[in-house]
Amino acid sequence: MSFASLPFVGLVAAGVILYYLVPKKLQWVVLLLASMVFYLAGGVKSAVWLVLVAALTWLTGLLLARQNARPAPDKQTKAAVRHVKKRICAVCAVLCFGLLYLMKYWNFTASALPSALGDKLPRWDFIVPMGLSYFIFQAVGYVIDVYRGKTDAQKNPLRYGLFVSFFPQMVQGPISRYDQLAPQLTAERCLDWRDLKFGIQLCLWGYFKKLVIADRAAVLVNAVIKDNCPYGGAVIASGILFYCIQLYCDFSGGIDITRGVARLFGIDMAENFRRPIFATSLTDYWRRWHITLGAWMRDYVFYPISLSRGFGKLSRWARTHIGGTAGKIFATSLATFIVYFIIGIWHGANFRYIAFGLWNGVLITASLLLEKTFLRWKAALHVNDKRAGWRVFMTLRTALLVFIGRYFTRAPRLRSVFTLLKTTVLHPQPGQLFDGTLLSLGLAKTDFLVIALGLIVLLALESLQERGVQIRAGLEKKSGFVQWAAMTALLLAVFLLGVFRAGYIPSGFIYTQF
């Protein structure tokens, strides 16, 4: 069930009406039923895997809670309890990530192995459940939080099931934390018109980014970025630029719809984007892009690795053989590299996604290792970090690195990445930008104008937000006429400028496949 479909709009409308009509103690049941309808619309087989993961992690949470409650009067007992908890948590994580590996990566592994070995391995054509990566990460995060004693285990399986399956987040996240989302899902609420208004505003803004900008940019991207691309480097670079536009408006637009729908029920979901276009480094970019995935990797991968006993030994060895500061940075850099390697694999079972993770991992690791050298250069050149020119330079440099990285995530295969990059650099053929080639790729002049105007609006609003301007709070101070006029203008823009064609089939979101 696509976000950009009438059945979804009908489900949300019916859900909101029922939510505020039923007794408050049953409101969470309405959310659970709506989530069941949404997920079952994608097929019963997919729902089975969701139920299995939810059941496994719920039971694991109860087992861990029982261990947490065990009396531990001495160090020996505490150590024994900790050992049992680690084993319980490890078994659950292996089963969950094993399922993820089996469904998303097994066939890729078999095909990547040498034929003498890979040909002997069976292939399975699984239908990967919608949101598999997202709900597994969210459920395992809950288990780890219970293991750490950060949150109490949920005893009610249906309430826990709602946390795992809450329908707005099933398409592409965000990856929520139990202590932040679960209490909101089961809270009792009265109708708040501000929540409805903010929710509608967020949804309309998300649909604007998705249907007006992203889906229009996708037409050019699909026409250019493909195997045996016949165009010169300038057109290819334009295709990647439009892909960057498509990806951001598609992903952030979908998250806006997710957060908007949740807000209709009075639920404030985690922010997943913070104006990544203004990032001044790759590290800063990943703090602004897909925030909940980065936070998950930080809390459940980076810290456990860097604080582990093995990494402690490695850090001490590095400080002894490389030097105090350099040794400490070496261990941190290695943990960082591992995280971005995993982020690359998370995006998909393809060597180009692994290369994407390595691209980011190598650059960010290098920045950590060379940070002091870079600071010395800045001091020698008397660079003022606060000057606008320096910030513009850092932002453009980061944008270029992100731009190059997008060749990896959009090219059909890894070999195509290097072919497209080579053509971009060695055979630019800039004349194709002006000889009518761009207008032969499926977009008319009016489409380019709509994209340009949409981006101007988007950049203007995000620029204000970057400066600390609270746009919705400012709009709230305006008269009711101005507020409804703004929402009406957005609604008209979506319906009049959205990419709806004859026989329209709602387009999916790019990050759904991840």
Enumerate the language-model features and the residues they cover.
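Membrane-embedded transmembrane alpha-helical bundles that form the catalytic cores
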Residues: 1-513
